[in-house]
């Protein structure tokens, strides 16, 4: 059992700070947190906390969604007895925290959508600010002098950024040109 927990923990730990898909399995009435099946079995359901939920979105049992894996920890402590009869504490299972409200979630969605542009240096994401459910601002730059990073991020007719906006419930996303001068950056953001 302990070896299974270690394997599950190690596998889950590699998913930290990445996007995953999961199915909403149970709403915890006292906290409004959701338990989410991400493929680790009933004993290791992930937790989609109220804090990680976007105020713009509504969730229903059975929804299949993308999440950002915020944190992976050992599960809850339990008391067990070893072979000699001594009581000891040990952690059982895995605790996986998910979010859809963080700026990291949006960053991963944008990186997924712009994989080619990021890989070839046309787009470099420099900063993201997010007010979940209201608006996200993304500051982009480029390593290429002949490329407009804002246009490359938005895509023809807005198709690339629209795909990300759809994933986050229609929340508005502003893409601005990055500048090292904070005054210019703020002016670009307004």
What is each PLM-predicted segment?
Residues 1-190:
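RNA-contacting regions in translation and RNA-metabolism proteins
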